[in-house]
Amino acid sequence: MRLRVSLVIGGLLAALLSPNSYALPEKFQSVPAPFVNFYKAPIGTSFKKIEQPRTFSLDKQSQININFNTTPDEYKPAIQAAVDVWSQSFKSAVPIQIEILYERQSSDKVLAAASPGRFFEGFAGAPDGQIWYAAAMANSLAGRDLDPANPEVTIRINSSNGNSLYLGTDGNCPISKFDLESIIIHELGHGLGFLSNSDYDSNFGTGSLTRPTPYDAYAQLPDGRRLMDVQSPSAELGKALTNTLVWSGANGIRVNNGVKPKLYTPANYEYGSSVSHLDEATFSRSAVDSVMTPNLANGEVFHSPGPLVVAMIEDMLVKPPAGIPVGLPQVPQNVRALVGDKSATLYFDPPINARVSQVSTYN
């Protein structure tokens, strides 16, 4: 009888300790993500075409599925070609669903716009628990689809520009048109996570950034602070969004010849464009790294994300270095206790300034 009881208890313990048994539900948060726009370059912008060879890898790094909806059939080859390019550069074991919408935008100056759909925070596998990751990036890190009901990327193609788009995939875009494959490659970059979640109030000159992305963690002010660590909302953050910001990630710096890549932060804030792009003046003439600048010139073609963008995404997939502490941590919030006969367990939420004061652990 004693042996039987021991065996039963042992079996129960083994079952309870099994990683697949009675697992607590994972807790994470998600919020809607904004759209980022891709604009036509100003009329008269000169562009010297530089031939860029299309690059192929033997194996795709991810499976990207497309829902074309009402997109015209003649657009599909260029869109598929752009998707194939990114499937060779973005690694994920979780399939990525893309929604293509063909619809009129607010201005014909907008070629297209893209959104990751949602940001996710606090999921198992997140490199940093205080950062909000774009859906495709979050799924890649988590190893599973955190939101199976919704696409990871949504791209809006401006239907009012139909006659000005080049739909071929051979790179021979005439100077009178805009290359659709290049547009989609750019927009997919945003959809996969190349974007800030900051916002700007032009009436008061204040900026806000309540849910920073990994992009915001690597965007750096001249004084060395991370963009995500500037008080939000504040006039100081508004000033930061309209002054010099650079990329501080090690991979991006290495690929950019040891120089911190400059981000696009015009003095007059541009909604849907500022911060979430590489600097136009610095990179628009680059043979390989002009992909994520905010404007596309007539006849401009790129059939690869470029080494700098790929390196910056690699930076975003790991935990960013701690920022510069600003002030001492304030008192914890919502403190409560579970009191027992011989012990008590305390529960609390982080101080309101935990991020800027660089609180990482509690002892």
Region roles according to the model:
Residues M1-V8:
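Bacterial N-terminal signal peptides that target proteins for export
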Residues R4, L16-P19, D341, Q358:
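Intrinsically disordered, low-complexity segments
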Residues V8-L16:
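Bacterial N-terminal signal peptides
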Residues L17-S18, Y200, I324, V356:
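Residue-level recognition of conserved structural "scaffold" positions that shape functional pockets
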Residues Y22-I185, G191-G323:
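Extracellular zinc-dependent metalloprotease catalytic-domain scaffold
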Residues G323-S360:
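Pro/Thr/Ser/Gly-rich low-complexity, intrinsically disordered linker/stalk tracts
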